[in-house]
């Protein structure tokens, strides 16, 4: 069995099937509930339905435990963040990262922006209007050409952002890109890591 995503190249899928291989196309979840369904269906596809159900049970238990901690954050104390990739701010309303930030009791600033042209690009002017408490910068040097430190310096010293709260208060944080683009049961770890980055005071004394 070859597990691929619905974003996989169709020609490659057809080639694998022509070789007699069974291909299972896993979905691309955009929220926690869809991720639960993906895990359950994948468990069935590999003949491990019970293990899939157990894994989802563990996910739900961990999320409930996390929620019991984060629900103590008053609505008026929720932080607003803007997450960046190496091109612009990211995380439109309805994207997976938007759902994960909401689960972590974090206001996703980009989700507040009307997306009239259905584009993922977010301008600097829009980021300034959001005026977030925190910037979340990327960490994945996926092609060995991304300068993480250089990008940090450019953001910190960009005149457009000089009056943004995240810059004025030196609130620039990093959450690994493996959590931004999570595609499995590790979504729970992603939500937890976003929460720890933004609300470290709620996790003091815990092992990292």
Regions found by a protein language model. Give the residues of each.
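Acidic/His-rich segments in extracytoplasmic proteins that coordinate ligands and/or metal ions
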Residues: 1-45, 122-160, 196
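Extracytoplasmic substrate-binding proteins
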Residues: 11-85, 89, 110-111, 167-208
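Short, conserved clusters of charged catalytic residues that mark active-site
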Residues: 61, 65, 119-122, 156
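Short gly/pro-enriched beta-turn/loop segments at secondary-structure junctions
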Residues: 75-79, 94-96, 103, 130
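Histidine- and/or cysteine-centered catalytic micro-motif in compact active-site loops
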Residues: 86-87, 113-115, 132, 140-141
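Short, solvent-exposed loop/turn elements at domain surfaces
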Residues: 89-93, 99, 137, 144-145, ...
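His/Asp/Glu-enriched short active-site or ligand-binding loop at hydrolase and phosphoryl-transfer sites
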Residues: 96-119, 174
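Short glycine/proline-rich, acidic loop/turn segments that cap or connect secondary-structure elements
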Residues: 155-173
